[in-house]
Amino acid sequence: MAETKVILTKTVSNLGHSGDVVDVKAGYARNYLFPQGLAFAWTKGAEAQITAMKRARLAKAVATREDAVAAKAAIEGTTVEIAAKVSESGKLFGGISNEAIAIALSDKAAVNPKAIEVETIKTTGDFPAKVALHPEITASFFVKVVAE
């Protein structure tokens, strides 16, 4: 199988980060990476572009790490309260979504709903949760569900 060198323009899971030079199958590059704008073909003249991308990625990583540390300080150990409709037995009509938790956290810090880890919430009570703010930084908090 033929392999080709490509330069990633965006982070691709299980492959690399922006600015990395990686070897991939020619079909994967031609049919997925190039059309999606995730990579371009490697050339000797592209070394300057690689250096610029790596510099930009490093600067962004430092900024996002500092933002994540500030967000962790605001979120860590807090409790967010969410009101929901409940039956007489105390069970929720539906459940509490990660989007609802992210909205409740929005006054403390902006978080990605996909980064929130919490067990399935189907009753009222307190539930431990975690949010990944950065690959190295997570914050723990509690979700309190009360009857509406």
UniProtKB/Swiss-Prot annotation:
Q: Which GO terms describe its cellular component?
A: ribonucleoprotein complex; ribosome
UniProt cross-references to Pfam families, sorted A to Z: Ribosomal_L9_C, Ribosomal_L9_N
Swiss-Prot/TrEMBL keywords: Ribonucleoprotein, Ribosomal protein, RNA-binding, rRNA-binding
**Single GO molecular-function term?**
structural constituent of ribosome
Matching InterPro entries:
Ribosomal_bL9, Ribosomal_bL9/RNase_H1_N, Ribosomal_bL9_bac/chp, Ribosomal_bL9_C, Ribosomal_bL9_C_sf, Ribosomal_bL9_N, Ribosomal_bL9_N_sf
Q: Which GO terms describe its biological process?
A: translation
Q: Which NCBIfam families match?
A: L9
Q: HAMAP family from the entry?
A: Ribosomal_bL9
| Family statement | Belongs to the bacterial ribosomal protein bL9 family.
Q: Describe its function.
A: Binds to the 23S rRNA.
Q: What is the protein's given name?
A: Large ribosomal subunit protein bL9
